[in-house]
Amino acid sequence: MSSAGRVKERTRLDPRIIDDKLAGLYHKGQDRIWNGKEYLQECLDKHGGINIKTNNVEALHNIFMIILWGELAAWKISASLATEIEDDSARMAATAQAHDEARHFYVMKDYLELLNGNTTKEDLNKHADRFLSYILDANHISKKLLGMQMMVEPLALTLFRIVREKDVDPVLSDLLIMFERDEARHVAFGTLHLPSVLRKMTTPQRVDLWIWQFRGYMKQFQILYSLEESFEQLGIRPRRVYEAARKKQLNAINIMADEMGIQYPFIDAMMRISDARYELGTASEDRPYLQRIRRATEKVLA
């Protein structure tokens, strides 16, 4: 087997432990179900309705339209995984996630309709639409797991945390606490189950997955670039969003590797190239292009 396609084995957890953890995600989801419509109304009553500066409405809408349609994509993918996955415990985890994503979608839709009344897909950022379609159209379980649990979910968690810390709207901040709690379980699903899928894949399939993942990361950049003005309007540094999302995505991959006893190939090189790509593409920092090239080169050679 070539080094490009090999997944190097280290100490592996007992499969029974993994099964218990996956089944545990299902039971935790059942124990922590919340009624989205009731909770949204409680938040509205608590804070006297949505309370946001008028000049921030469009920026917040731009960001959370991506979250809305990302939740729908996650709902569709997790429901699909629940029928495609053969392992019973993993199927339970996927089923629990589908329930969570359905709730997130309708709650966010209700919130955005209260914010400015527009939630049609025609108003969705075109780069986000392309990225989500890229994952929805994936032709293998590994791509759906990796794309949703290790790319989309960490980015969503990053946006939840940063926007909540800014407290742009107290109602949204309270909603995001509940969203974050659910989404953390979804990342765990990916870190626990993806390694067992990888072990069953052929070398060409693994290489195809790494290439697909890299292309997905590049598509994410277009989303972040397109939102830079919206971030700045809300007082959020675009670079902070990139760095925080990068950290969460890398952490998810490392947890997967450590828990399952594998060494994930190419990740260091992929992150260096990603950092360089960000330096070249961001328009939020006023730097001469030659300085951008220098910084990008430093990232690649780091």
Each model region followed by its residue ranges:
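Short helix-loop-helix connector
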Residues: 85-86, 164-168, 180
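Soluble, non-transmembrane catalytic domains of enzymes that act on hydrophobic metabolites at membranes
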Residues: 168, 191-196, 200-207
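Amphipathic alpha-helical segments within well-ordered protein domains
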Residues: 78-82, 95, 161-164, 176-177, ...
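Terminal targeting/low-complexity segments that flank the catalytic cores of oxidoreductases
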Residues: 1-92, 113-129, 138-143, 201-204, ...
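All-alpha helical catalytic cores of prenyl diphosphate-utilizing isoprenoid enzymes
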Residues: 115-132, 137-167, 172
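Short, charged, amphipathic alpha-helical segments
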Residues: 92-96, 174-177, 207-208
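Alpha-helical transition-metal enzyme core signature, strongest for iron centers
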Residues: 67-75, 97-112, 146-157, 179-190, ...
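Hydrophobic, aromatic-enriched interface-forming segments
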Residues: 172-175, 182
